[in-house]
């Protein structure tokens, strides 16, 4: 069930979101949390880190699943979403890497600029179809992982100024 909260400012939003996550983890210490990246949740992650450092939050049994990852960046790249999450939350709450999940981009697609040739006149070639197949398989595997975890107990999303969620822009089909 979705709930909406109207708050005064970013700081209050961060506090409210952190309080909701804190409550979920308190009620279910092995919660599966869906997390997002970007500027919106940074304040929330900072609040959770403060709760952890104060000894009020135990995250040792939670599992996290992130919305997305960049195609073309390795997991260790400083601009990857894994790096973002380690810096902004995981390291601050002592969360082990084996309890965090991201879409696994096939290694052979790690440098997409070399693997995705331009199409001519919108005609797809075999390489593009191979890449689409590999990405569809990545999505299928991530869906399977989410099902095996029983879905998410709580999903944190940021909505951009233009209404985008993740890389889904207004007008995109789901």
Where are the predicted features?
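Glycine-rich loop at the start of a catalytic domain that most often binds anionic cofactors/ligands
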Residues: 42-56, 78
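Glycine-rich beta-strand-to-loop/alpha-helix junction loops that act as flexible
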Residues: 35-40, 157-161
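Generic structural signal for well-ordered alpha-helical scaffold segments
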Residues: 18-26, 49, 53, 86-90, ...
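Ligand-binding beta-strand-loop-alpha-helix segment within the catalytic cores
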Residues: 1, 57-154
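Short glycine-rich or small-residue beta-strand-to-loop segments that form or flank ligand, phosphate
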Residues: 32-36, 65-68
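Class I SAM-dependent methyltransferase SAM-binding "motif I" and its flanking Rossmann-like core
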Residues: 166-174
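N-terminal glycine-/serine-/threonine-rich phosphate-binding loop
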Residues: 1-33, 50, 100, 114-116, ...
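Gly/serine-rich nucleotide phosphate-binding loop at the start of the catalytic core
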Residues: 10-11, 39-43
């Amino acid at each position: 069930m979705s709930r909406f909260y109207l708050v005064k400012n970013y700081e209050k939003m961060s506090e409210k979101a952190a309080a909701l996550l804190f409550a979920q983890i308190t009620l279910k210490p092995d919660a599966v949390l869906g997390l997002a990246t970007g500027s919106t949740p940074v304040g929330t992650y900072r609040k959770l880190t403060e709760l952890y450092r104060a000894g009020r939050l135990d995250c040792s049994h939670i599992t996290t699943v992130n919305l997305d990852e960049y195609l073309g960046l390795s997991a260790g790249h400083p601009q990857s979403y894994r790096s973002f999450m380690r810096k902004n939350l995981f390291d601050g709450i002592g969360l082990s890497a084996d309890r965090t999940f991201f879409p696994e981009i096939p290694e052979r697609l790690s440098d997409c600029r070399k693997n995705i040739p331009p199409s001519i006149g919108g005609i797809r070639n075999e390489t593009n179809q191979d890449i689409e197949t590999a990405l569809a398989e990545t999505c299928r595997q991530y869906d399977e992982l989410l099902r095996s975890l029983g879905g998410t107990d709580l999903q944190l999303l940021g909505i951009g100024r233009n209404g985008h969620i993740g890389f889904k822009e207004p007008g995109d089909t789901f």
